[in-house]
Amino acid sequence: MAVDDYEELLKYYELHETVGTGGFAKVKLASHLITGEKVAIKIMDKESLGDDLPRVKTEIDAMKNLSHQHVCRLYHVIETPKKIFMVLEYCPGGELFDYIIAKDRLTEEEARVFFRQIVSAVAYIHSQGYAHRDLKPENLLIDEDQNLKLIDFGLCAKPKGGLDYHLMTCCGSPAYAAPELIQGKAYIGSEADIWSMGVLMYALMCGYLPFDDDNVMVLYKKIMRGKYEIPKWLSPGSVLLLSQMMQVDPKKRITVKHLLNHPWLMHGYSCPVEWQSKYPLGYIDEDCVTELSVFYKYSRTSTTRLISEWSYDHITASYLLLHSKKSHGKAVRLKHPLAVGDQAVTSFKELRPKSKLDFEEPNGEIAYVFGSMDFSDEELFSEDFTYSSFEPHTPKEYVKGRLEFNSVDSAPATPVVQRNARHKNEDKENSNTAVARDENVFLHPAPWTPTPRRKQNEKKGILTTPNKNTQTKEKNQSKETPTKKPIGTGEEFANVISPERRCRSVELDLNQAHIDSAQKKKGAKVFGSLERGLDKMITMLTPSKRKGYTREGPRKLRAHYNVTTTNIVNPEQLLNQIVRVLPSKNVDYVQKGYTLKCKTQSDFGKVTMQFELEVCQLSKSEVVGIRRQRLKGDAWVYKRLVEDILSSCKV
């Protein structure tokens, strides 16, 4: 880790453990120093990105202009010569995919709750002129209140002529791709999203995909036929809705507008799906402004002006995280400057809107498009809308791989599948969303002021659903357990925290790069020295000690849907069984305590899957469990593999 690359980031955040990895990025859990709020930081290496750099630009531009209760919030963007950091809303519930496989499948009632939120998010982004183009359970996260947040806008499109403008680039995940995409035809982005939503809803209620095959070309043929299996547990209403979304002819597909108050989505509800944003960026909360101005000793007028520039720097992040605290019923308070060092305070006044990120800009000046769909001016549900139906049938299987290939003006009838087909200057489908800071671009409806609410812990209970004969697996919920040190609470931050302790979590002593020790009080220096010596002593004596571990056994965790319970009472016995099984499944692993860091590789040595299996003790019981976390690789392949491993362990 180069000091220069992380110097700016460490002024404002304390890094914790890695919670996800990808082809060119990793995601770390972190704490915002002055609010104490948890965030997720997506760390991307520019050199590794290569020709995918425009995709990052697309994602950042989209997230800067999307603010919705079911869209993951962007807080802060930091660029260095080698790195790009995206500071995002942290969703401790993990991926919706993991939730599905842990429960085998969802009941119709639970699927309806989630699907209404998905429709809300998609209707909103369509109203802002965007098509997502990569809708799938892995791109929906669950927050602390069991609400969904849509993520990963790297493949989204904002057509220059609005959503009725035809697109040509075929992208996304093969199993969720609409027939017109894989045929290489020009398509409407919003129509393709509807098909993906149908596949997603099917996965919610069935626990597997409607179209799947290990051979991608066979998979395409199944998709183009549009025939899939109808399990006996699906109700007539859900079967009808699935058929309306997964119509091979995009013109016969139901629209988002008609989904908003579709009978299936309205069942048990008195109002249509609310798609409008409750958090328009044009609204600035006075309580948050007051706290920021007092904390930084800056005038309210100047503070308001800096916030309203929406530069997605530390000012934006501090305001949005403070506002998030308020909306969750927490005190609108920032931590004392001594607890976070003077750098954050002095930097606030010095921060000004910076130049755009160093991305290649599209040619020409394109008008910025807002609200290409106006749902409120028309009847939400047309009486003359005719629902077409058919009898789909396809056996259950699993998917693998991700589709992303680009076509130019004339697309071939049979597309050539490529893993990373990139064109350096290609972003022809998106309008120029780079926003000049002196322009009034945030034209929003009247703001909705969130009323403070307490965390609704009762909503976190997992509904019971009939399960198959194998216990299913899923990704990390243990994101709340830092690898290097526990995440500080508000009370912990009230004390003076030396920069040495704060930087320990990123494995290097980076504090000298960004802490001016001359600004520290003498007492702070003394305590910092004592703490530094104490840290060294603890590290020498217990180099692998982690929060929750004891010499006697594994960590104690709360029962969660990413923890599989077992009938084995001896944790060492369970760990040994897993270790014996892994080689037979061609899984390499490294053992650290009761955690097994696993990976699979292709014949050419490329890592295709990374995940963790941890033997743990469930709190308030003597039951031993296995925590599962997918870090990298295809979700459905991961599902099969971990099911196979645990089945062989006979747990």
From Swiss-Prot:
Span of domain Protein kinase: 13-265
User: The KA1 domain covers which part of the protein?
Assistant: 602-651
What are the EC numbers? Answer: 2.7.11.1
A GO CC annotation given for this chain: cytoplasm
- The UniProt record gives the binding positions of ATP as V19, G20, T21, G22, G23, F24, A25, K26, V27, K42
| A Pfam family of this chain | Pkinase
Q: Which SMART domains match?
A: S_TKc (SM00220)
Q: Which Gene3D superfamilies match?
A: Kinase associated domain 1, KA1, Transferase(Phosphotransferase) domain 1
Taking the first listed entry, what is the main subcellular location of this protein, grouped into a coarse class?
A: membrane
> Where's it found, cell-wise?
Cell membrane
Family annotation (InterPro entries): KA1/Ssp2_C, KA1_dom, Kinase-like_dom_sf, MELK, MELK_UBA, Prot_kinase_dom, Protein_kinase_ATP_BS, Ser/Thr_kinase_AS
**Sequence segments annotated as region (Disordered):** 410-490
Compositionally biased spans, kind Basic and acidic residues: 423-441, 471-483
Entry membrane topology: Peripheral membrane protein
An example GO BP is: hemopoiesis
Q: Which residues form the active site?
A: D134 (proton acceptor)
Consult the record and explain the modifications the protein receives after translation: Autophosphorylated: autophosphorylation of the T-loop at Thr-169 and Ser-173 is required for activation. Phosphorylated by the maturation promoting factor (MPF), composed of cdk1 and a cyclin-B. Also phosphorylated by some MAPK. Phosphorylated during oocyte maturation. Dephosphorylation destabilizes the protein. There is some ambiguity for some phosphosites: Thr-481/Thr-483 and Ser-505/Ser-517.
**What does the UniProt entry state concerning the protein's domains?**
The KA1 domain mediates binding to phospholipids and targeting to membranes.
Q: What is this protein called?
A: Maternal embryonic leucine zipper kinase
- Organism per entry: Xenopus laevis (African clawed frog)
Gene responsible for this protein:
melk
